[in-house]
Amino acid sequence: MAANATTNPSQLLPLELVDKCIGSRIHIVMKSDKEIVGTLLGFDDFVNMVLEDVTEFEITPEGRRITKLDQILLNGNNITMLVPGGEGPEV
């Protein structure tokens, strides 16, 4: 697969896409009933992420809970989907 990426420059690998998102807003859907929106500061090979200016949306039995956080370290094991430039669920 890596050889194919070098012969086709228009192909973008997953970690390259995440790398292009550094410094911009990203919407993250988690395996649990949480969604997170924040500015991506950095990530590692396991897609653990450091985010700032974070809003966490969580579905609870009482309804939707919204939490604002300055900075977080997010474990990549719990990520289902990344949306570059996403603004999160409608409130």
Curated annotation (Swiss-Prot):
InterPro entries: LSm5, LSM_dom_sf, Sm, Sm_dom_euk/arc. Keywords: Acetylation, mRNA processing, mRNA splicing, Nucleus, Ribonucleoprotein, RNA-binding, Spliceosome. GO terms for biological process: mRNA catabolic process; mRNA processing; mRNA splicing, via spliceosome; response to bacterium. GO terms for cellular component: cytoplasm; cytosol; Lsm1-7-Pat1 complex; Lsm2-8 complex; nucleoplasm; nucleus; U2-type precatalytic spliceosome; U4/U6 x U5 tri-snRNP complex. This is U6 snRNA-associated Sm-like protein LSm5. The keyword Acetylation applies. GO terms for molecular function: protein heterodimerization activity; RNA binding. Its main location: nucleus. PANTHER family: U6 SNRNA-ASSOCIATED PROTEIN (PTHR20971), U6 SNRNA-ASSOCIATED SM-LIKE PROTEIN LSM5 (PTHR20971:SF0).
